[in-house]
């Protein structure tokens, strides 16, 4: 069974790269019916203190560098340190965002944020060492359920992050057609090395 699953995953990966239109249709017609199970020692913790927020900044620095590497210039990537992101997280926390850390035993290896005011999810990151274990899917599901007052929460995703978009579609999220941000290297002062867009996705179950 595991070999068949692996072969199926490899086939879908080739389709994603060669025929993204077919892959999109497959994702929308094959929802995830069962998420990975939470394991012993794995939990989410609400960020309450400066030490935890510093952990979030470190996770965000690693996550943003990974996501932005294909589209940002090297100078901007080098700026993405924990100290660079900490002020942003601090301001967001003051303005209604709640952040949660994902722990495996006592090690923080992922994070996600939710904003109850506007029904938005953001800053979904998993460390490189913890990727491929289903943590991202579990955290997104956790975050959505933290917003019961919003039937259709939203989030932003880079158009170049096709793997994430595919996963989110299989979890009931859809692109709304709204472009939240555009980054064009032709514009003066931009940090983008190639043109990219942050797209809005909405949960539609």
Regions found by a protein language model. Give the residues of each.
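A short helix-loop-beta-strand connector motif used in the catalytic cores of GNAT acetyltransferases and
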Residues: 83-101, 120
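A short beta-loop-alpha structural element at the N-terminal edge
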Residues: 43-59
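A short, internal acetyl-CoA/4′-phosphopantetheine-binding micro-motif in the GNAT/acyltransferase core
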Residues: 121-131, 157-158
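C-terminal "cap" of GNAT-fold acetyltransferases
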Residues: 153-165, 169-174, 178-205
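Conserved beta-strand in the GNAT
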Residues: 101, 106-125
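Long, charged alpha-helical interface segments
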Residues: 1-27
